[in-house]
């Protein structure tokens, strides 16, 4: 294919081209070992080196304190919706959740299988278009933890602050914005993220958890759902997703070579500005429903003034090499996911196309 394709999928999502090239070059023979990474024993010295480097590079990128464990798990963020309450209740009678969209609702529904859930705040009063300020939250002092969804992938709503909860552990689903900017990990009790948006291929789930929150799962908790098991055995209780860890490790190295998360944050801010400016300047031809301070830098949903033009818009986008722009099935419209690996050039082409299409059809 001669045309450059820019993939705006929400996940699995675009990976850095240089990472894909390295994967291709090493696919049949990793570093002269005579093996593909896919063929390696997860306990062999070759893969142990890959895993150790991936963990250290991630620790460096996020400046993760020594009293936090990094776990490489499976099951996606959806499994974390259950693992979090299973492991973090610690004898408390309830957990608190901030409801900001579809994914936080899913986390709430799953948590209710295991404990009482207190809705500390909700944005449904304004059609899930903002993040409630912490001053408006109602959090019981005896709650086990407070859970937030840092970025709602479908609604395009992103937190613009880290809540200060004192001694109450803060838990964040960071699946779609992890590594997009510097983050003070010490402000959180636990962070989890499915890999397939900003980390690497599907199949890997990342958990960063503070040491004091380990070891509290009920005695009858299934072994594979206990964080302490993975922490004790360095994510090797059973065979981990080896190839996904390998690719994630390459992405971590790419981020470090780029200049780290401060540099990545600058690039992401520019990319998001390109799209939101094109939407806002369209005089209503396009609309994004999210309040400005909470507009996601990673997922930009928008609608056309006339939904009858959606198919023409998507067809035209495809002719420009812009794919996977159709919105989530639950909300319709369009969505451009512009994760770390999406080149700025691709976002510029999309912004130009938005303006051209509006001129032709407005």
Curated annotation (Swiss-Prot):
Q: Which CDD domains match?
A: PSAT_like
GO CC terms of this entry? cytoplasm
One annotated GO molecular function: O-phospho-L-serine:2-oxoglutarate aminotransferase activity
Q: EC top class, in one word?
A: transferase
Q: What is its EC number?
A: 2.6.1.52
The encoding gene is: serC
Q: What is this protein called?
A: Phosphoserine aminotransferase
- State the function annotated in the UniProt record: Catalyzes the reversible conversion of 3-phosphohydroxypyruvate to phosphoserine and of 3-hydroxy-2-oxo-4-phosphonooxybutanoate to phosphohydroxythreonine.
Q: What is the lineage of its organism?
A: Bacteria, Pseudomonadati, Pseudomonadota, Acidithiobacillia, Acidithiobacillales
């Amino acid at each position: 294919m001669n045309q450059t394709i820019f993939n705006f999928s929400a996940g699995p999502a675009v990976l850095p081209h240089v990472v894909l090239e390295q994967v291709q070059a090493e696919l049949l023979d990793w570093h002269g070992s005579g093996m593909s990474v896919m063929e390696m024993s997860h306990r062999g010295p070759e893969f142990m080196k890959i895993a150790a480097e991936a963990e250290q590079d991630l620790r460096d990128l996020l400046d993760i304190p020594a009293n936090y464990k990094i776990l490489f798990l499976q099951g996606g963020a959806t499994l974390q919706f259950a693992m979090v309450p299973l492991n973090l209740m610690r004898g408390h009678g309830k957990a608190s959740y901030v409801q900001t969209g579809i994914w936080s609702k899913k986390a709430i529904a799953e948590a209710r299988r295991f404990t009482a859930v207190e809705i500390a705040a909700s944005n449904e009063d304004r059609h899930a278009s903002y993040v409630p300020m912490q001053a408006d939250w109602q959090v019981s002092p005896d709650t086990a933890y407070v859970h937030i969804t840092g970025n709602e992938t479908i609604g395009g709503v992103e937190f613009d602050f880290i809540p200060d909860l004192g001694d109450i552990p803060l838990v964040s689903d960071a699946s779609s914005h992890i590594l997009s900017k510097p983050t003070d990990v010490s402000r959180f009790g636990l962070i989890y993220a499915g890999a397939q948006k900003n980390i690497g291929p599907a199949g890997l789930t990342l958990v960063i958890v503070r040491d004091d929150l380990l070891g509290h799962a009920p005695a009858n908790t299934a072994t594979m759902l206990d964080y302490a098991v993975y922490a004790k055995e360095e994510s090797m209780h059973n065979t981990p997703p080896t190839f996904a860890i390998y690719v994630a490790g390459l992405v971590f190295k790419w981020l470090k070579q780029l200049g780290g998360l401060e540099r990545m944050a600058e690039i992401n801010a520019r990319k998001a500005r390109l799209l939101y400016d094109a939407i806002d300047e369209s005089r209503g031809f396009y609309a994004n429903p999210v309040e400005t301070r909470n507009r996601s830098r990673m997922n930009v949903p928008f609608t056309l003034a006339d939904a009858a033009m959606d198919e023409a818009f998507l067809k035209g986008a495809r002719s420009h090499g812009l794919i996977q722009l159709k919105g989530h099935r639950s909300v319709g419209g369009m969505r451009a996911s512009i994760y770390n690996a999406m080149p700025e050039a691709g976002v510029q082409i999309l912004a130009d196309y938005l303006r051209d299409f509006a001129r032709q059809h407005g």
